[in-house]
Design a protein with these regions (language model features):
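Structural and coupling elements of P-loop NTPases
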Residues: 1-412
């Protein structure tokens, strides 16, 4: 409850880094009031108390933030001057400090590798390209993104970044992309723990709403991914349609790649939501996830309508004509579960019967729209997502097809 006539209490629920004011804690004042230059007590973990002074104060009104001299209970404010502030801390009255119930932050469940972009198109669009730029940006993010973890690897241009899910990490990637960074990211992997000699993996509670027509398709796919159905009920709408509401307990790795797959199989009618539940013992049997094969560009150049037309019967295309490609770039999904090197830069040459430009009109299937969410769900262990300010590209880790064949034979 909001109490005006009481000592100051404010629970910090978010952090923001201001270039001029430093780190600012954001939260709603539960009781009392706060003013600029006021001395307060910061109540942290395990009863820690640190005195501090409010150097700057801003009040939120909708999406706008305005500097103020003071704020009262019920207002959402941003407080500067407390360098040690963290999510879950209480900003309290200096003379009568009483902590509010602390919020807990979920541990990371998914990790992926962020590395310097080393593709043939590297450096064309971005402003920040080097490992130093990447390292500074990732470690700066730790100041406000408290559930993120960044670890250095044995390679100076590669970092292991862990977060609370694919969405958490994709938001960071999109922010960096808009800021002008170029980077490459790997396939997301779940983080497993070992407790008492047992391997523990993260599980989530998954809620799905889907038209009754597609319930069999959804249930079959979730069964392959070790989903355990907890609840199912039929929902009748006012317009005469029926939908199934399904609740599942499922491993986090069973959710990876699930959204786009179900959207395709249900013609875009499925709605799903998932939240972290707990770490539980990992089952020995593996997920029955169907592997995918990719169409991989065989040479550098610009794609042509003729080559796309001849290739599209092999599977779903990710690019259209007139797109620059490089050898080893993934340009589509093969209809078979194996990679296929294709030449999408091939020109139609003239013959002694007709000129190269005179032929029937080519009907090209529109390419699949490339989004960051789709890219992260699609890529396999031997593929990367190339992220630049203007483009998202999929590529093989090893661009040379001979190197890929050698690696496959050696089992790497």
């Amino acid at each position: 409850a909001i109490t005006v006539d009481a000592p100051l209490q404010m629970l910090v629920l978010a952090l923001v880094q201001d270039p001029y004011k430093g780190k600012m804690g954001i939260g709603k004042i539960q009781s009392g009031s706060i003013a600029r230059r006021q001395t307060v007590m910061l109540l942290g973990k395990d009863g820690a108390q640190v005195a501090g002074k409010v150097s700057d104060l801003a009040v939120y009104s909708g999406l706008d933030r305005a500097d103020m001299e003071q704020a009262a209970a019920g207002e959402i404010v941003a407080v500067a001057g407390l360098d040690d502030v963290s999510i879950g801390d209480t900003i309290a009255d200096a003379d009568r400090p009483v902590a509010l119930p602390r919020v807990t932050i979920d541990e990371p469940t998914v990790q992926m590798t962020f590395s310097v972009n080393n593709s043939p198109f590297a450096g064309r669009e971005g402003k920040f390209l080097t490992s130093r730029h990447l390292r500074e940006r990732l470690f700066k993010e730790l100041e406000t993104n408290v559930s993120l973890r960044v670890n250095e690897t044995d390679s100076a241009d590669r970092f292991l970044v862990a977060g609370r899910g694919e969405l958490h990490l994709s938001v960071l990637i999109e922010q960096m992309r808009r800021e002008g960074y170029e980077l490459q990211v790997s396939q997301p992997e779940v983080i497993v723990h070992r407790e008492g000699g047992k391997v523990m993996e993260p599980y989530e509670e998954l809620t799905i709403q889907v038209p009754e027509t597609y319930q069999g398709t959804v249930i079959e796919e979730l069964g392959k991914r070790r989903g355990e159905m907890r609840h199912m009920r039929l929902i009748h709408s006012d317009v005469g349609t029926s939908e199934m509401h399904l609740e599942y307990h499922i491993p986090t790795r069973g959710i990876m790649g699930l959204k786009n797959l179900l959207l395709a199989k249900t013609r875009g009618t499925v709605i799903l939501h998932h939240v972290f539940a707990a770490y539980e013992p990992a089952e020995e049997r593996d997920l029955l996830v169907t592997p995918h094969g990719s169409l991989v560009a065989y040479e550098d150049g610009a794609s042509t309508g003729y080559a796309i037309f001849m290739t599209q019967e092999r599977g779903a295309m990710f690019i259209g004509p007139g797109v620059e490609v490089y050898r080893g770039m993934v340009i589509g999904q093969n209809s078979r579960d194996e990679d296929l090197d294709v030449n999408v830069c091939k020109e139609k040459h003239l013959s002694n019967m007709r000129a190269s430009g005179t032929d029937e009109a080519l009907v090209l299937t529109p390419p699949r729209e490339m989004t960051l969410e789709f890219a992260l769900e699609y890529i396999g262990g031997d593929e990367l997502v190339e992220v630049t300010p203007q483009h998202l590209r999929l590529r093989k880790r090893l661009l040379n097809p001979d190197d890929r064949r050698k690696a496959k034979k050696s089992g790497k």
